[in-house]
Amino acid sequence: SKEDLCFYMEKIKKISEEMVRDGMSHPTMFEIETALSFLYFLDKKVDVVLLETGMGGRLDATNVVKKPIAVIIASIGMDHMQFLGDTIEKIAAEKAGIIKEGCPVISYNNQESVNEVIKEKAKEMHCKVTFVNSEGIRVLSESLNGESFSYRSSDGRWYEKIEIPLLGRHQINNAALALEALNTIRNYYCISEFQTEDGLRKTIWRGRIEILEKD
């Protein structure tokens, strides 16, 4: 709410001013937003937080969680090269910087050189890594109303028909990644297949290939 936003911004403003007085740099806008979200989640006692990095991973403001339930790495491309590196492998190494000791890693099935970087980091941190089974995706339908697909997960679990209202083949790949992540999270939370399928069916991403109006 607007009241919550003002309350936490006042707290962070006070701390930011103290940091500057002590000779430290003023937090960036993203660092402020990250701190605000952590304070809010703590006070509201949320059950689960799906935390997205701002850029990269290793040096990202969000990369302070010591023991996440799982680490999820999505598709890796040539983004933010001036900060993350000039090759896909260097960028992958920065992204893999969110991998924590002993935490399960679930990753999009990127090109082999990228997968190798992720596997190497996971091995170093004693983590089990699971990749999306790209061969297990079968597109059933694609339209302006959304997509449907079947999926055989990496552990053999069969999803006969998953429906998502999001547009684009990449969203099918993202949904498969979400399914793999949920398979891991089931070790901690009771999540039924109905809840999984219903959640994906109701997923909304405002402003991302969103149809605003139809004739």
Model-derived features: positions:
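Acidic, Mg2+-coordinating active-site environments of NTP-dependent enzymes
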Residues: 19-21, 44-52, 68-161, 175, ...
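Short alpha-helical
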Residues: 57, 113, 204
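A short glycine/serine-rich beta->alpha loop
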Residues: 20-25, 163-169
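Short, intrinsically disordered, charge-balanced linker/junction segments flanking boundaries
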Residues: 210-215
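ATP-dependent carboxylate-amine ligase catalytic core
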Residues: 1-66, 82-84
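Glycine-rich, charged/polar anion/phosphate-binding loops
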Residues: 56-59, 133, 165, 208
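Short glycine/threonine-rich catalytic loop with a Thr-x-Gly-x-Asp
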Residues: 166-179, 204-207
